[in-house]
Amino acid sequence: MIDTATLNGARDSINSDFQGIVLVDSLGTEVSDVIPTSSTPDFTPTYVWDTTTDGRIQLAQDVPFSIAAGVEVAGWRAKSGTTDIGGNWTWDTGFILGEDFNTSVTFSSAGEFTLEGIPTYIQISLV
């Protein structure tokens, strides 16, 4: 059994890298703009991760994404970013982690996809 302090230490370490969230298609390609989930030098996020449950990182609220016509949405990924020497924020390539949905949806016309906060989480378990 892992003690709560160790479990939450792992959770908090991973959470510090979760700076944005993006939707992906079934190939893992980004299909939406990145929505910031932590503060950057010039931005305070609307959407954040909740860490009040031991060992869990969960979206604190639903996150809406604008989706173009013909785009498939099949999952979400957490991203990190960096500030360059000039103080400009850029998103890192690649993802930290995320989840694929049981089924994907393809938008026949432009619309909105809402990633629901309650079922969107990462459960940390150290074995």
Predicted regions and their residues:
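Small cysteine-rich, disulfide-bonded extracellular modules of the LU/uPAR three-finger superfamily
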Residues: M1-W76, S80-V127
